[in-house]
Amino acid sequence: MSPAGKLPSEAERILVRKSGAWTNPSYGSYPEKRPILEYIEKGVVNIDKPKGPTSHEVAAWVKAILGVSTAGHAGSLDPKVTGLLPTLLGKATKAVPALRLSGKEYVCLLKLHKEMPQKLVRKVCEEFTGPIYQMPPIKSAVKRVIRIRTIYYLEVLEIEGSFVLFRVGCEAGTYIRKLCHDIGLALGCGGHMQELRRTKAGPFTEETLVTLQDLKDAYVLWKEDGDESEIRRVIMPMETAVSHLPKIILRDSAVDAICSGAALAVPGITSLDANLKKGELIALFTLKGELVALAKAEMSTEELLKASTGLAATSVRIMMEIGTYPKGWTKKEYGVES
């Protein structure tokens, strides 16, 4: 389990250096310094979803406000649920799957069908941490089979009569409505979810929330007055959406190879996450902090630090355009056929 109040995505990540390198300022761009149109098309906005609309409706409104090519949210919230709805814009939407798989935190109001001793309520809630079995609700978009989901932490915040306010950190795909039902069953009195708000989603927290009105105001300020300050505040670089993933930092000379579909060779690495595991999803970055691709690690950190040749990672989703950095590789070297 995670430390109290922490999702796995909030674990501190340490980079270890494999080899020295420098980055050419003539190529690429630091994410926060991208030209405004590119900044928006490669951005993410942490929307505070109001009660009422569906998640898809909110994403459609974001798309309409900004005039972007597309917008995709990272994890649906039911119409009555409020809170974090990270919405990726334009080219950044290719990173949506990486964010959807990250852990989530909610604050929930549970209504018990009968007032129960507070000590018992707290004890039963504690028992719902760790792996739990869940059957998706009847009104669900997924096949109804029993699944295992992990509850990282569950903290009872307040009990008043038959109402229980709690905070829960859980694996993606956990049904909080079903969790409330199961807690009620375990207490022997029954219960249901009264209200729900999402407070964390992967690397996103309530500290960076913006409303749809905030977004609209920032857009109007930019379009009518030429002031980019607010639009750059409410929209974050797409790199924020994958900041929770283990990472490898690339040499400038390796970047275009990845953009062209090649696997990452060991010589292209300058630094890497201290705890990479073979087979896990990782993010490949430039020395300027730009996201190049999502990839699958082909070696662990220990193996990579010892290796001088071989394939370090294979791309899953390429995020950067070919030609952003100059070619510094050969097709033969990287295994790309002519």
UniProtKB/Swiss-Prot annotation:
The active site is at D78 (nucleophile). Gene3D superfamilies: Pseudouridine synthase, PUA domain. Signal peptide: none annotated. CDD domains: PseudoU_synth_hDyskerin, PUA_Cbf5. Keywords: Isomerase, tRNA processing. InterPro entries: Dyskerin-like (IPR012960), PsdUridine_synth_cat_dom_sf (IPR020103), PsdUridine_synth_N (IPR002501), PUA (IPR002478), PUA-like_sf (IPR015947), PUA_sf (IPR036974), tRNA_PsdUridine_synth_B_fam (IPR004802), TruB_arch (IPR026326). The keyword Oxidoreductase does not apply. GO terms for molecular function: RNA binding; tRNA pseudouridine(55) synthase activity. Pfam families: DKCLD, PUA, TruB_C_2, TruB_N. The keyword Phosphoprotein does not apply. Could be responsible for synthesis of pseudouridine from uracil-55 in the psi GC loop of transfer RNAs. This is Probable tRNA pseudouridine synthase B. It comes from Methanosarcina barkeri (strain Fusaro / DSM 804). The lineage of its organism: Archaea, Methanobacteriati, Methanobacteriota, Stenosarchaea group, Methanomicrobia. The gene is truB.
